Amino acid sequence: MTKAKFEIDNAAARALFLDRHALTNRSTQALTEADLYALIHKLGFVQLDSVNAVERAHHMILFSRGSGYRRELLHTLHHDHRSLFEHWTHDASLIPMEFYPHWHHRFAAAKARLKHPNWSSRIGDDPAKVISRVRAHIRKNGETLARAFEDKGGGGWWGWGPSKTALEHLWRTGELAIVRRDGFEKVYDLSTRVIPDDLREARPTRKKTIDWAARTALARLGFATHQELAAFFALISIAEAKAWAVAALKRGDIIEVMVTGEDGNAKAALALPDIEAELAAADTPHPELRFLSPFDPAIRDRKRTLRLFGFDYTIEIFVPEKKRKYGYYVLPIMEGDRFIGRADMKAHRGDDRLEVKGLWLEKGIKLDKARKQSLEAALAELGQFTGATRIDAGAPLRRAKA
C-alpha cells in the first residue's frame, strides 16, 4: 500500500512560508551587521532594483523585516567586509559571498553564450579589441564606472556603448566583480581584487551545484515544486531540478507532501523529511501590519502567492498608464499571515512627502478603527524611513473606509 502523503493545512503552510521569508516577526531594534548578514543568508539573496518611486527594492525588502534597518549597513557588508557579492539570480541581487563558487557555472554559461555572433557583435566590429582595452584600463586604474569610457550609445545592450557592453560581458563571465554601487551605478574591478581567492578558485562540479541549489532553495522555501526549486536562484534548469528531486525521493532525502491552498485545494510539493518539526518550530505570524516591496521574495512567484494566500498581485510598472488596474508602484499590505490590500504610493522627496495615491482593500476586509490606526502607524514608519515628514493619505483612507 502506498503511504499517504503528509498533509499541510493552509494556516500551517502560510506560517512556515512566512517564517522562512522572515515575515513572522519584525524587529524594531537597530540591526547590527551580523543581524543583517544573517537575514540575507536566511533569504538566500536580496534583489536589487533601481526604481525609487517609494524606496529601492533592496532597502524596502530589508526594512519590511526590521524597522531598525539602516541603508549604510548593506554597503558595509558588500563593499567594506566583502560578505556579499553582486550577480544574477532571477535578477540582479546581492548574494552571500560563501555561495560564490556555485556561480562559476553561470559564468561559464555566459561565456559560451556571449561567444555567439548575435551577442559579441553588440560590443562592436572588433569585440576582442574592445574587451582587451576595457580589461587593461581596469587592471591599470582599478575601480571603474562605465562613464569612465567615452563611447556611448549607438547599439549594445539597452543603448550601451561598446565599452559598457564589454564591462557587462566581463562581469557576467566572472572576470570582473562589482565592488559597490555609487548611487545606483555599478563600480567594477577585477574579481581577483574583490573575491577571496579560495572562493574564486573553487570549482564545484555541476552535480554538486545542482544538489546545493535545490537543497538550499528547499530549506528557504519550506516546501516547493521542482519548478520552484529551479527558479529560486535560477542557477539550475527545471529538468535538472526534476531529476534531482526524483533521485532525492528515492534516497529518502526529501518527501512528498500535500499543501492546501487558500481555496481549499491541495497541491503536491517537496519538503525535507523533518517537515513536521519545521512546522512546529515556525513562529506564528505577528498580526502587525506592514508594506512589502513589489519585488519582495515572498511574492515573487505570483501563482504561488495566489495559491497560498488568495492574493492576486501584478507589478504594473511596465503596463501603460491607461491600462493599469491599480497604479505604477503598488505595495502589498500584509497583516499577520494574510494580504489585506494594496496601496499605490509615491515619495515626493523634493517636499518631504509620502503620497498614497490609491488604497484598495481585499474582499471582506473592513477599515475599522483599529486597522486604520495600524495602517496610519505603518505609513508613518515608512514615511520616516523614506525621509518624508508628511503623509498624504487622507482621501484614499476615506474612500477605503466608505
Q: Could you say what each language-model-derived stretch is?
A:
Residues M1-A402:
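Long, charged, low-complexity, helical-prone intrinsically disordered regions
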